[in-house]
Amino acid sequence: MGLIWGLFSVIIASVAQLSLGFAASHLPPMTHLWDFIAALLAFGLDARILLLGLLGYLLSVFCWYKTLHKLALSKAYALLSMSYVLVWIASMVLPGREGTFSLKALLGVACIMSGLMLIFLPTTKQRY
């Protein structure tokens, strides 16, 4: 059950990160504080997406709390690296995102996935 909570946490955190990235690119910069505050108070689509992203992170923390009670810490923290993979893929696939493909990033994703497989695949016990 800890793995399920961990996967929920990773997926929710990834969606939250994408939401915050979208909101940050569409809201006025915080260097123009009054424009930024006015955009938040208008509670348009960008402000709502910002709020959903923040609430997503809060929900992700709850799932992470449940994960840490059910899953070994060494496995739980390795699971977090999946968020990098999900956000990278989503940034290239989702419309309006400007993620770019590179062999260097693909190599990084391959390393992350290889590490996760080493940690999570069952091992066979050898008898001596």
From Swiss-Prot:
Heterodimer of ArnE and ArnF. Keywords: Cell inner membrane, Cell membrane, Lipid A biosynthesis, Lipid biosynthesis, Lipid metabolism, Lipopolysaccharide biosynthesis, Membrane, Transmembrane, Transmembrane helix, Transport. It is a multi-pass membrane protein. The chain crosses the membrane at residues 3-23, 36-56, 76-96, 101-121. It comes from the Bacteria. Translocates 4-amino-4-deoxy-L-arabinose-phosphoundecaprenol (alpha-L-Ara4N-phosphoundecaprenol) from the cytoplasmic to the periplasmic side of the inner membrane. GO terms for biological process: lipid A biosynthetic process; lipopolysaccharide biosynthetic process. InterPro entries: Flippase_ArnF, Small_drug/metabolite_transptr. One of its GO terms (cellular component) is plasma membrane. NCBIfam families: PRK02971.1-2. Pathway: Bacterial outer membrane biogenesis; lipopolysaccharide biosynthesis. This is Probable 4-amino-4-deoxy-L-arabinose-phosphoundecaprenol flippase subunit ArnF. Residues 1-2, 57-75, 122-128 are cytoplasmic. Residues 24-35, 97-100 are periplasmic. SUPFAM superfamilies: Multidrug resistance efflux transporter EmrE (SSF103481). It is found in: Cell inner membrane. Its main location: membrane. The keyword Lipid biosynthesis applies. The keyword ATP-binding does not apply. Belongs to the ArnF family. One of its GO terms (molecular function) is carbohydrate derivative transmembrane transporter activity. The gene is arnF.
